[in-house]
Swiss-Prot record:
InterPro entries from the UniProt entry: Ribosomal_uL22 (IPR001063), Ribosomal_uL22_CS (IPR018260), Ribosomal_uL22_euk/arc (IPR005721), Ribosomal_uL22_sf (IPR036394)
SUPFAM superfamilies: Ribosomal protein L22 (SSF54843)
Species whose genome carries this gene: Drosophila yakuba
UniProt record similarity statement: Belongs to the universal ribosomal protein uL22 family.
GO molecular function, one term: structural constituent of ribosome
UniProt keyword annotation of Ribonucleoprotein present: yes
UniProt KW Ribonucleoprotein keyword: yes
Cellular component GO terms, alphabetical: cytosolic large ribosomal subunit
Protein name: Large ribosomal subunit protein uL22
Signal peptide, first to last residue: none
Residues covered by region (Disordered): 157-186
Gene: RpL17
Biased composition (Basic and acidic residues): 157-167, 177-186
Keyword annotations: Ribonucleoprotein, Ribosomal protein
Database matches in PROSITE patterns: RIBOSOMAL_L22 (PS00464)
Length: 186
C-alpha cells in the first residue's frame, strides 16, 4: 500500500486512489487538478468530459507562461486557459477508480466531494534528439504522481424552529408604560 501525503479526517467516510509515474505532463495535470479540487464528484467528472470536448477550459494560474487567452477562462475569473485533453483523461480515469473504491466501501457516490488532490513530479525520462553538426540534445518527459481522496459530504442539519416565536425583550420604560395602561383600563 502506497503512502499518501495526507490522511482523511474520517476514514470510514472517505476513499482514495493514486496513480504513480503517469506519462502525462506534470504542469498541465497540476492545473487540471487544481480546477477540480473541492468539486463534487459528479460535477468533476462532467467538467473533465467537457474539457476533453473543449466545452470548458482549464484555468492556468501558476504555470501560465506563454499560455494564450481564451474566453472560457472568464468563468474562473482569469484570462489564460487551455484544454489539456490527456491530463483530463488521466484524472477522469483516476476519479472512476476512486468511485469504484467508494462503491466497494459502501459510500454514496452522489455525496462524494474531491477533498484532496495532489500532483507531484515523477522522475524524468530521458530520450535524445539529433541536431545539426553531429550534436545530440536531451528530449525529456515530465511524468507525475497523482493522488486523490474523496470524502462523503456531511449533511447540514438545520436548526429546529420553536412553535412560539421568541418575544422581544422590552425595555424598562416600555414595561412600565404597559403596566400603566393595564391599570388604567381596569
Amino acid at each position: 500500500m502506497g503512502r499518501y501525503s495526507r490522511e482523511s479526517d474520517n476514514v470510514a467516510k472517505s476513499c482514495k486512489a493514486r496513480g504513480p509515474n503517469l506519462r502525462v505532463h506534470f504542469k498541465n495535470t497540476h492545473e487540471t487538478a487544481q480546477a477540480i479540487k473541492r468539486m463534487p464528484l459528479r460535477r468533476a467528472q462532467r467538467y473533465l468530459k467537457a474539457v476533453i470536448d473543449q466545452k470548458e477550459c482549464v484555468p492556468f494560474r501558476r504555470f501560465n507562461g506563454g499560455v494564450g487567452r481564451c474566453a472560457q477562462a472568464k468563468q474562473w475569473k482569469t484570462t489564460q486557459g487551455r484544454w489539456p485533453k490527456k491530463s483530463a483523461e488521466f484524472l477522469l480515469q483516476l476519479l472512476r477508480n476512486a468511485e469504484a473504491n467508494a462503491d466497494c466501501k459502501g459510500l454514496d457516490a452522489d455525496r462524494l466531494v474531491v477533498h484532496h488532490i495532489q500532483v507531484n513530479r515523477a522522475q524524468c525520462l530521458r530520450r535524445r534528439t539529433y541536431r545539426a553538426h553531429g550534436r545530440i540534445n536531451p528530449y525529456m518527459s515530465s511524468p507525475c504522481h497523482v493522488e486523490v481522496i474523496l470524502t462523503e459530504k456531511e449533511e447540514v442539519v438545520s436548526k429546529a424552529t420553536d412553535d412560539e416565536p421568541t418575544k422581544k425583550k422590552l425595555s424598562k420604560k416600555k414595561l412600565q408604560r404597559q403596566k400603566e395602561k393595564m391599570l388604567r383600563s381596569e
